[in-house]
């Protein structure tokens, strides 16, 4: 029979084994359809692709804002013809002024 002191020394020297789970949904059993519909839950993030996407979306929004601003400026101008037949651009003014 072994002494209690030898059993306690063995228990202290070896750490308890713990099973660690993988973070997120990578360790969960799911269907192929769920993985195909929600790939962002299972794929490791790719920083260069994220940066490219953010820059692309920002440029698209800036371009749309630019088009909106230039179109708005064009609406305030119109082409007028004077009595001599010369064409010139003029800012629109209210009929009531």
From Swiss-Prot:
Region (Disordered): 1-26
Regions of compositional bias (Low complexity) in chain numbering: 1-14
Keyword line: Membrane, Transmembrane, Transmembrane helix
Transmembrane segments: 49-69
InterPro entries xrefs: UPF0708 (IPR026686)
Pfam families per record: DUF4500
PANTHER family: SMALL INTEGRAL MEMBRANE PROTEIN 8
Protein family (similarity comment): Belongs to the SMIM8 family.
Protein name, as recorded: Small integral membrane protein 8
Organism: Xenopus tropicalis
């Amino acid at each position: 029979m072994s002494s209690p002191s030898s059993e306690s020394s063995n228990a202290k020297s070896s750490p308890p084994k713990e099973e660690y789970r993988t973070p997120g949904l990578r360790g969960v059993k799911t269907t192929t359809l769920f993985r195909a519909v929600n790939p962002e839950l299972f794929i490791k993030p790719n920083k260069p692709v994220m940066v490219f996407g953010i820059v692309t979306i920002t440029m698209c929004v800036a371009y749309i804002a630019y088009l909106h601003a230039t179109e708005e400026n064009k609406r305030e101008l119109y082409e007028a013809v004077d009595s001599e037949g010369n064409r010139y651009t003029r800012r629109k003014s209210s009929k009531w002024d």
